[in-house]
């Protein structure tokens, strides 16, 4: 192996990345610096993480609080676009990868490291997402992906490897699920979910209550939207992070934001996951409610196209690309009109807009009324219909010749 000097590892403190540190030292003869991105994962995952990294053999461990930036600069912009991957998934894991990779590259550059490492497996999407970002931001840096090189392909072998290296770990063979958590969502994969006929059990859900345990009475909340972003919850103006945290708390007790889906991974494998995105789900529905008021037909169709394309761009890890920037610019332009207030009814997993208003609303009661009005001439429709149906009329006439 080449004698590298310093490697910056995207470190989670879990079993995989704990084993990667001694493996890098043994196989690449390097100094390992652990980089930890705090994007809202559980505090128990972060408690003592610096000590854990050093015990595993890292020469240093740095933790960066990225929660506010993550929600403000990554989650909120994507919510504007209405992106839902394959019609269901609010991209909670995918959207977190660009900021981790970006900050990892910046940190590596600041300490003079030329080598990057991640703990993504060779079967998943994250290896692609990380390495596309690395290529876009630091093409001169070498990437080490241990899961594509080593033979430690089971939990048992990883635990045995750490024992051989006399590295303490709290991990056991009991863990059967793979989880990913940030301020937007938490995902659960593996274990009994790998058999599609198995129903998710209580262990598959972490944030939200069961539908049966949700309150018997609905809760009504008010959101204020400005330029396509939620800025206030129940008349309390908050930062993006505080908005999502408050809505996560409210939504979780009403079983909102649960999905159990089978998705198409970028690498061609279908995978099943239980995702919980309570706050993001509430925001998504609120934004679409205001859009109904302010978008004309063509604007609405265009926003839907943006959302469809953006969902693939984000899922695939193409954040640092011209197409993502172009889609975002278009969504930002449309969202400049998305201002207003919406009241939502939360009840046993459902989010129902019940009141909405906007100063930019194109809805006019005078025109829409089923009663008598003085602004709409019904006779005007005759000419419109004749022109709108002209091609159909000519086609039918041709068949009669």
Swiss-Prot record:
The keyword Amino-acid biosynthesis applies. Keywords: Amino-acid biosynthesis, Arginine biosynthesis, ATP-binding, Cytoplasm, Ligase, Nucleotide-binding. It catalyses: L-citrulline + L-aspartate + ATP = 2-(N(omega)-L-arginino)succinate + AMP + diphosphate + H(+). One of its GO terms (biological process) is argininosuccinate metabolic process. ATP binds at residues 10-18, 37, 119. L-aspartate binds at residues 121, 125-126. Its EC number is 6.3.4.5. GO terms for molecular function: argininosuccinate synthase activity; ATP binding. Pathway: Amino-acid biosynthesis; L-arginine biosynthesis; L-arginine from L-ornithine and carbamoyl phosphate: step 2/3. This is Argininosuccinate synthase. It comes from Buchnera aphidicola subsp. Schizaphis graminum (strain Sg). The gene is argG.
